[in-house]
Amino acid sequence: MRKYEVIFILRPDLEEEKNAEVIEKFKNLIESHGGEIIKIDKWGKRRLAYEVKDFREGFYIVIQINAEPKLAAELDRVFKITDEVLRHMIVRENE
């Protein structure tokens, strides 16, 4: 297993319950594919460096996980088709 840092930005117009729903969706996806969640950080609403999909702010989430490379690819695929996610990035951390 490799260590990854998953960062994603949710739309700022979502309600708190919807944010929690989306986070839970990705948490369940990670665990169902054999990944291990180390830590979840909610940075809250922050200003974006530039406009993304007509939004100037976003709700930042950072998740540290241990996972196989196949899971990272699956997460990337699901992030791309999830409307609530403005941007995402998956980075492999050095051991």
Swiss-Prot record:
A single GO cellular-component term on record: ribonucleoprotein complex
GO MF annotation terms: small ribosomal subunit rRNA binding; structural constituent of ribosome
SUPFAM superfamilies: Ribosomal protein S6
Pfam family, one: Ribosomal_S6
Source taxon at top rank: Bacteria
Keyword set includes NAD: no
GO biological process terms held by the UniProt record: translation
Keywords assigned by UniProt, alphabetized: Ribonucleoprotein, Ribosomal protein, RNA-binding, rRNA-binding
InterPro entries noted in UniProt: Ribosomal_bS6, Ribosomal_bS6_sf, Ribosomal_S6_plastid/chlpt, Transl_elong_EF1B/ribsomal_bS6
Record carries keyword RNA-binding: yes
Disulfide bond positions: none
The protein's role, per its UniProt record: Binds together with bS18 to 16S ribosomal RNA.
NCBIfam families assigned to the protein according to its UniProt record, in alphabetical order: S6 (TIGR00166)
Family, similarity comment: Belongs to the bacterial ribosomal protein bS6 family.
Name the UniProt record assigns to this protein: Small ribosomal subunit protein bS6
Species assigned in the record: Pelotomaculum thermopropionicum (strain DSM 13744 / JCM 10971 / SI)
Taxon lineage: Bacteria, Bacillati, Bacillota, Clostridia, Eubacteriales
